[in-house]
Amino acid sequence: MSEITLGKYLFERLSQVNCNTVFGLPGDFNLSLLDKLYEVKGMRWAGNANELNAAYAADGYARIKGMSCIITTFGVGELSALNGIAGSYAEHVGVLHVVGVPSISSQAKQLLLHHTLGNGDFTVFHRMSANISETTAMITDIANAPAEIDRCIRTTYTTQRPVYLGLPANLVDLNVPAKLLETPIDLSLKPNDAEAEAEVVRTVVELIKDAKNPVILADACASRHDVKAETKKLMDLTQFPVYVTPMGKGAIDEQHPRYGGVYVGTLSRPEVKKAVESADLILSIGALLSDFNTGSFSYSYKTKNIVEFHSDHIKIRNATFPGVQMKFALQKLLDAIPEVVKDYKPVAVPARVPITKSTPANTPMKQEWMWNHLGNFLREGDIVIAETGTSAFGINQTTFPTDVYAIVQVLWGSIGFTVGALLGATMAAEELDPKKRVILFIGDGSLQLTVQEISTMIRWGLKPYIFVLNNNGYTIEKLIHGPHAEYNEIQGWDHLALLPTFGARNYETHRVATTGEWEKLTQDKDFQDNSKIRMIEVMLPVFDAPQNLVKQAQLTAATNAKQ
């Protein structure tokens, strides 16, 4: 019988689910495992600068390709990744965290090994990860190891949550039957309970029949749990007005004639706020009702006719249907409503915000102007990444072309996340279409947390756009508290020296301080082509911020001060 090592089995399985790049760092408990990656055609080891950045990169990759894998070493390595893994858990991103752990015999003898706490407890780090993992596995028996690997990959993909997999150093070189690879991992969702699903569909159909002014509200999990196609069909079939939340940016086509804008509670444009809150039926798809996603919980629906479609349950008014998955329920709903909506008379959606006329070329750059004009630079198929802070709020003012995907960590909000996410997303984009552009907007403060990963981009010849918004410090924190506090200040960097410092040869750097310089640069044909890595420093006033961020900061400060 043909056999392969357990380590090679893992990478063959990852290759089969199109997870072709693995992130992480080498450590003595995973070195033998990493040897096996190079035995599998088409697999790539990213080789990150540190484990936290690797976790961020795995998150960015998974958002584009459906799942990812990070490999760390026991203790010191895995713990360094946990902030990033927690963010993936919070934001519904499927990351398989493989940890190389000491051999089974070392654990049994409770040896006082390096990277331990010195107390003989080899399960403590596994237990730490359990609360931010959908499931965990610590392989102890080669006989069931392939099945456990398959289970972990399946769970990562189908639940869109991180999964922890511990692989002892002595097991990865042991053999397992190669024939197991002939049976693909089943990545399909289990069907809904037919009776519960039918009741959901019947109830929603009746609500739609009675509605005169329904709206669709697309949120984060419309993207994360793969119902973008179903959401588009629902838009096309019903012609209901459609809105997105900040976390829902990119979930629908913003060029669709029924698209009405971004709903953020009291932070919404007045006409958007009125349209959503006056609806008599709200079909909410994939909601994550966090503070920054809802304008500090300021939703003010006038109707109680709210249907929440989630990945693992559906809520209709006050009734919850556990275990009913939205993907199948939406498909059944689409089959059931053509007759119901045929006489629906479409309600007008709010008019698009017109882009202001050109300003004098020497006008200093401001956030409001930049975000409103950014759509002119974007093109179909772009991946846009916006860092926590001014970028995460400003991007809500930008109307996207068709098929633009957005990565914004609105819920977890770990500053510096997007540098690693840019690496992962760019590697994923390169595997899908080398011409696909990946564009990052990040503040000067956030960049300082994770800047090392730019060197990994250069190492792999990646060609992203990195827009550094230089407003001299942590602007979002200044707006919330301590506008002149020393702790919100940073050391200024020579940003345009970073690419050559990290060893770049084929690169461009630009500094933009006026609207004329912005327009000249972004309209340049060569600049529009992702032929090289680029860093663009955008010079902005110290306290300049999108108006929504100013308002959100006031709400957050008030929340923090409540007794």
Curated annotation (Swiss-Prot):
Activity regulation: Allosterically activated by its substrate, pyruvate.
Which chain positions lie within coiled-coil regions?
A: none
Predominant location of this chain? cytoplasm
Which SUPFAM superfamilies does its entry note?
A: DHS-like NAD/FAD-binding domain, Thiamin diphosphate-binding fold (THDP-binding)
Looking up InterPro entries in the UniProt record yields:
DHS-like_NAD/FAD-binding_dom, PDC/IPDC-like, THDP-binding, Thiamin_PyroP_enz_cen_dom, Thiamin_PyroP_enz_TPP-bd_dom, TPP-bd_CS, TPP_enzyme_TPP-bd, TPP_PDC_IPDC
Q: Give the signal peptide, or none.
A: none
In its UniProt record, a GO molecular function of this protein is: phenylpyruvate decarboxylase activity
- Pfam family name, one: TPP_enzyme_N
* GO BP terms in the entry: aromatic amino acid family catabolic process to alcohol via Ehrlich pathway; branched-chain amino acid catabolic process; glycolytic fermentation to ethanol; L-phenylalanine catabolic process; L-tryptophan catabolic process
Which signals induce this protein? Protein expression is strongly induced by high concentrations of fermentable carbon sources, under anaerobic growth conditions, and by thiamine limitation, but is repressed by the presence of PDC1 (independent of its catalytic activity) and thiamine.
Reaction catalyzed: pyruvate + H(+) = acetaldehyde + CO2; 3-methyl-2-oxobutanoate + H(+) = 2-methylpropanal + CO2; (S)-3-methyl-2-oxopentanoate + H(+) = 2-methylbutanal + CO2; indole-3-pyruvate + H(+) = indole-3-acetaldehyde + CO2
Keyword annotations for this protein, in alphabetical order, are: Allosteric enzyme, Branched-chain amino acid catabolism, Cytoplasm, Decarboxylase, Lyase, Magnesium, Metal-binding, Nucleus, Phenylalanine catabolism, Thiamine pyrophosphate, Tryptophan catabolism
What Enzyme Commission number(s) does the record list for this chain? 4.1.1.-, 4.1.1.43, 4.1.1.72, 4.1.1.74
- For the protein in the UniProt heading, the enzyme class is lyase
Compartments where located: Cytoplasm; Nucleus
Under Gene3D superfamilies, the record lists:
3.40.50.970, TPP-binding domain
What's the biotech application?
Fusel oils and acyloins are important flavor and aroma compounds in yeast-fermented products contributing to the quality of beverages and food, e.g. fusel oils in whiskey, contrary to common believe, seem to alleviate hangover. In general they are desirable at low concentrations, whereas high concentrations may spoil the product. By adjusting growth conditions and substrate their production is sought to be influenced. Due to their broad substrate tolerance pyruvate decarboxylases are important biocatalysts for chemoenzymatic syntheses, both by fermentation and in vitro, e.g.
Tell me which residues bind Mg(2+): 444, 471, 473
Amino acids binding pyruvate 1: 28, 115, 477
**Co-factor requirement:** Mg(2+); thiamine diphosphate
What family is this protein classified in? Belongs to the TPP enzyme family.
Q: Sorted alphabetically, which PANTHER family does this protein's record hold?
A: PYRUVATE DECARBOXYLASE, PYRUVATE DECARBOXYLASE ISOZYME 1-RELATED
The task this protein performs is described as: Second most abundant of three pyruvate decarboxylases (PDC1, PDC5, PDC6) implicated in the nonoxidative conversion of pyruvate to acetaldehyde and carbon dioxide during alcoholic fermentation. Most of the produced acetaldehyde is subsequently reduced to ethanol, but some is required for cytosolic acetyl-CoA production for biosynthetic pathways. The enzyme is also one of five 2-oxo acid decarboxylases (PDC1, PDC5, PDC6, ARO10, and THI3) able to decarboxylate more complex 2-oxo acids (alpha-keto-acids) than pyruvate, which seem mainly involved in amino acid catabolism.
More about this protein: Present with 471316 molecules/cell in log phase SD medium.
This protein's name? Pyruvate decarboxylase isozyme 2
What is the protein's species of origin?
Saccharomyces cerevisiae (strain ATCC 204508 / S288c)
**Encoding gene per record:** PDC5
